[in-house]
Structures are given as structure tokens and as C-alpha cells.
């Protein structure tokens, strides 16, 4: 997701995306613990996306 797309989301959309991405991250970590996933960089990318969404949510909340 690009930065411009993140900035265009509403506060409610940001909250929903954060919850969805956290669930996705949990599933990825669990799948990687059982057997290595094909692209382990997905975990890092998802974690960074959550951070970007959280940062934008904080900026919009102020």
C-alpha cells in the first residue's frame, strides 16, 4: 500500500486495516513457525505496513 493511499483513508478505515493486518501478521508468524513460508519478507513488510497505518492514525487523531 502506497503512502498516498494510506493518507487517503479515513480514521475508521485505518482502524479496520490495522486490525486486519495484525491478524494477517499473526497468521504469517504462526505459519512460518510450523514450516518456513515461501517469502519470509512478507512478515517484515506486514509489520512495516502496520507501523505506517498506526502512524497515520495517530497523525489524524491529533
From Swiss-Prot:
Gene3D superfamilies: 1.10.287.310. InterPro entries: Ribosomal_uL29, Ribosomal_uL29_CS, Ribosomal_uL29_sf. One of its GO terms (cellular component) is ribonucleoprotein complex. PROSITE patterns: RIBOSOMAL_L29. Transmembrane segments: none annotated. One of its GO terms (molecular function) is structural constituent of ribosome. Keywords: Ribonucleoprotein, Ribosomal protein. One of its GO terms (biological process) is translation. Pfam families: Ribosomal_L29. Belongs to the universal ribosomal protein uL29 family. This is Large ribosomal subunit protein uL29. It comes from Cytophaga hutchinsonii (strain ATCC 33406 / DSM 1761 / CIP 103989 / NBRC 15051 / NCIMB 9469 / D465). The lineage of its organism: Bacteria, Pseudomonadati, Bacteroidota, Cytophagia, Cytophagales.
